[in-house]
Design a protein with these regions (language model features):
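Functionally constrained cores in energy, signaling, and assembly domains
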Residues: 77, 82, 92, 135-137, ...
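Catalytic metal-binding acidic patch
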Residues: 113-148, 156
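Catalytic nucleotidyl-transfer cores of nucleotide-processing enzymes
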Residues: 150-163
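N-terminal regions immediately upstream of nucleotidyltransferase
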Residues: 1-111, 128
Length: 163
């Protein structure tokens, strides 16, 4: 009986460090270095897929390690998984609009709203579940808007997400 608390303390120290790292991942923005984006011959879509994929896989690995140590963390992990996916979607949209399809003077027809629906929208997303997104555009959509949505979807598909 005396050894049991020691074992719990040993298990809690690594899990606390993992949880801190997970929170840090959620708080740290996913940004592409502006120096890289201006270099000639850079395939921005491939760069985004690499950077976003690295972030997402690293964060998922952290969640898996936490769950391996503490299976009772599952309800929180579902919320964190949704938040990580949310951050990935937001970063994808922002980077596509700012780096791949920048527009200096957008009109009212060049606006896009992305909504999360289903389990993802409720922040109850299980690992490997599909991601339900709703794109809302103005009645008169432009070629720019179609290109942005297409690029967002291709990047998310390249990340092996089920959209």
């Amino acid at each position: 009986m005396i050894d049991a608390p020691k074992k719990n303390l040993v298990k809690q120290k690594p899990i606390q460090a993992l949880k801190k790292q997970l929170l840090l991942n959620l708080e740290t923005p996913i940004q592409i270095d502006p120096k890289i984006t201006t270099a000639a011959g850079i395939d921005m879509r491939a760069l985004l897929v690499t950077e976003l994929g690295s972030y997402y896989q690293g964060s998922r690995d952290l969640l898996k390690k936490i769950l391996d140590i503490d299976p009772l963390y599952a309800p929180k992990a579902v919320n964190y998984y949704s938040l990580l996916t949310d951050k990935l979607i937001i970063s994808t949209v922002e980077n596509v609009i700012n780096l791949i399809h920048p527009i200096s003077n957008p009109t009212n027809s060049e606006k896009i709203c992305v909504l999360a629906v289903g389990g993802f929208g409720r922040e109850q997303m299980a690992p490997f579940s599909d991601i339900d997104l709703l794109f809302i555009t103005p009645y008169k959509q432009t070629a720019w808007g179609e290109s942005v949505i297409e690029s967002i979807l291709y990047i998310l598909w390249d990340l092996k997400l089920k959209i």
